[in-house]
Amino acid sequence: MAEVKLGMKTQVPASVESQKPRSKKAPDFPIVEKQNWLIHLHYIRKDYEACKAVIKEQLQETQGLCEYAIYVQALIFRLEGNIQESLELFQTCAVLSPQCADNLKQVARSLFLLGKHKAATEVYNEAAKLNQKDWEICHNLGVCYTYLKQFNKAQDQLHSALQLNKHDLTYIMLGKIHLLQGDLDKAIEIYKKAVEFSPENTELLTTLGLLYLQLGVYQKAFEHLGNALTYDPANYKAILAAGSMMQTHGDFDVALTKYRVVACAIPESPPLWNNIGMCFFGKKKYVAAISCLKRANYLAPFDWKILYNLGLVHLTMQQYASAFHFLSAAINFQPKMGELYMLLAVALTNLEDIENARRAYVEAVRLDKCNPLVNLNYAVLLYNQGEKKSALAQYQEMEKKVNFLKDNSPLEFDSEMVEMAQKLGAALQVGEALVWTKPVKDPKTKHRTNSGSKSATLQQPLGSIQALGQAMSSAAAYRKILSGAVGAQLPKPPSLPLEPEPEPTVEASPTEASEQKKEK
């Protein structure tokens, strides 16, 4: 028994030891970033209401010191259009973490969206000091300098961005700067490099095709537009440009077939309805042409090319008062184009307002130094008024322009223009066919009026297509993959590269609007 008791005594301490309470759990100290994973999850799922609820809870727990929660809330405010509120929150993030370049980039972007481009450049320069190898900072600086019209600085920054990381949007912005400076050759070189880097980018292919189209290099234009349509058969900009090329060469039915496809994608496009209207004009369906052009004018009331075409069609239909109305409106928007004044003078002549017609011709002669039709029409008016000496002076000026054009280009003149010049030369006793030595090719379409008024132009008609501006404003979809564990600071969503604003578009070749009215 003694041994048993002794054994029990030896077991008691072990049992008591096992029943002692364990040491208390370590206290939970508040972790500022403990809800970051949940905030990030709601944000990438675009569940912004739930995201804002978690952010509010997190900021209450951390007394407003959670940088990531503030950052994401600022992003949501920006998406909702509250740019000023987002700017203030990004500035708070910059105060909490002054060495973080991402915070400064977002501050600068908000300033840019508020139109404060100079302030944005200053903040971007501060961010560049913290991270000198960020292509995004260089690109956005280039965009800001572009809006400030400091094109040299903008080019330097964009070239730096390309050295750090080649990106389609940077090429587009650099090409746009060259276009703003009027340097079409350099713009084409930039877009060629961009196409080499990204050969399947339909925006770049379409833009390059349009630039070649503007230069009249139809083979290369058709090649690049065809490539764009190969990768994206529904690319309405390329289809519109291809239709314009066909329209320029008189294939109105084929062009209308192309435009029918485009109308499904962009039914409210002013250039589309302008082109359709001029196709009907080339087919001599004038009522349909006016209907389409007036729709284009309704969609773009300040486009002078549409007004020009409306004036031209009304002249063809002998509706001279309406033609005067539209041509006057076009002159208000484009006061430096001599051909508009010539057409206005034709309308005024048929309205029997000779004094104002003479003034319009004087202005047309002053502004247009290349088109012999201006001088020919003016000479006809002067001859009809009995001023043969002044008419002879205008006729001789016309001869100089014709000789210059024949020496410098293989241009074929309108047969009715040649006939009228020969008749006027005979009437002025200067002989016939003095400058018309080349055979004349009849145009496909001629538009006459009972009053004997016909105007024509030696250049391609105006206002057929305006697709390049949209092509130059592609959006960047630049994102990073965000990952992280509970309690870890997640990477912040990057600031998107700034996108160029759509500018007034570069025109491609118009249609048979060159069949204008020349006075007889």
Curated annotation (Swiss-Prot):
Organism domain of life: Eukaryota
Keywords of this entry: Cell membrane, Cell projection, Cilium, Cilium biogenesis/degradation, Cytoplasm, Cytoskeleton, Flagellum, Membrane, Protein transport, Repeat, TPR repeat, Transport
Region listing for Required for localization to centrosomes, in residue ranges: 1-66, 338-520
Any Pfam family the entry gives: TPR_16
Tissue spec. comment: Expressed in the hippocampus and dentate gyrus, the columnar epithelial cells of bronchioles, the olfactory epithelium and the inner segment and outer nuclear layer of the retina. Expressed in testis.
InterPro entries the UniProt entry points to: TPR-like_helical_dom_sf (IPR011990), TPR_rpt (IPR019734)
GO MF terms, alphabetically ordered: alpha-tubulin binding; beta-tubulin binding; dynactin binding; protein-macromolecule adaptor activity; RNA polymerase II-specific DNA-binding transcription factor binding
GO cellular component, one term: photoreceptor outer segment
GO biological process, one term: B cell homeostasis
Residue segments, region Interaction with PCM1: 101-337
Family affiliation: Belongs to the BBS4 family.
Oligomer status and interactors: Part of BBSome complex, that contains BBS1, BBS2, BBS4, BBS5, BBS7, BBS8/TTC8, BBS9 and BBIP10. Interacts with PCM1 and DCTN1. Interacts with DC28B. Interacts with ALDOB and C2CD3. Interacts with PKD1. Interacts with CEP290. Interacts with DLEC1.
Protein function: The BBSome complex is thought to function as a coat complex required for sorting of specific membrane proteins to the primary cilia. The BBSome complex is required for ciliogenesis but is dispensable for centriolar satellite function. This ciliogenic function is mediated in part by the Rab8 GDP/GTP exchange factor, which localizes to the basal body and contacts the BBSome. Rab8(GTP) enters the primary cilium and promotes extension of the ciliary membrane.
Name the record gives this protein: BBSome complex member BBS4
Source organism (scientific name): Mus musculus
Gene designation per UniProt: Bbs4
